[in-house]
Amino acid sequence: MINRYERLNQELKMVETKRKVAAYCRVSTDNEDQANSFESQQRYFRQYIERNPDWELYEIFADEGISGTNTKKRKEFNRMIACAKNGDFDLIITKEISRFARNTLDSIYYTRELKKHGVGVIFMNDNINTLDGDAELRLAIMSSIAQEESRKTSERVKCPVLQAHILSGH
């Protein structure tokens, strides 16, 4: 029979070996559907991390109503990167590459920076863990696809505005 002190010691060792995990989510607009998605992403990450016995939730970083094409205006993203470089957590999980960055160079740059500090990124829907050997190649390919999707979306949004402008004689 294990006495109280031995059990407490075992529990402390378990806590010490848990990985601190941060999650990152982002939605690009403030509309109601996106807001619901934003809330559901946060709830999903919280539950996902809680279900993994080796993980401990550090924090959910979330940018709302901000495009993923540029990291400068994404306060929570930048705060997450700073916390990672500070050694506050070990791993970031995010839904997919396009939520993390819609620019190939940013994706590669930030995942390399994080890796230098021992922090991996798991892109769940893309099945990429940046601590895996072939991750950077797959990340580059998938990031390029996300960047192209962003460009096409931007064109679709701008096209009706441009057509209306031309038709109005301006």
Model-derived features: positions:
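Short, structured surface patches at the beginning of a domain
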Residues: 1-164
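Short, intrinsically disordered, charge-balanced linker/junction segments flanking boundaries
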Residues: 169-170
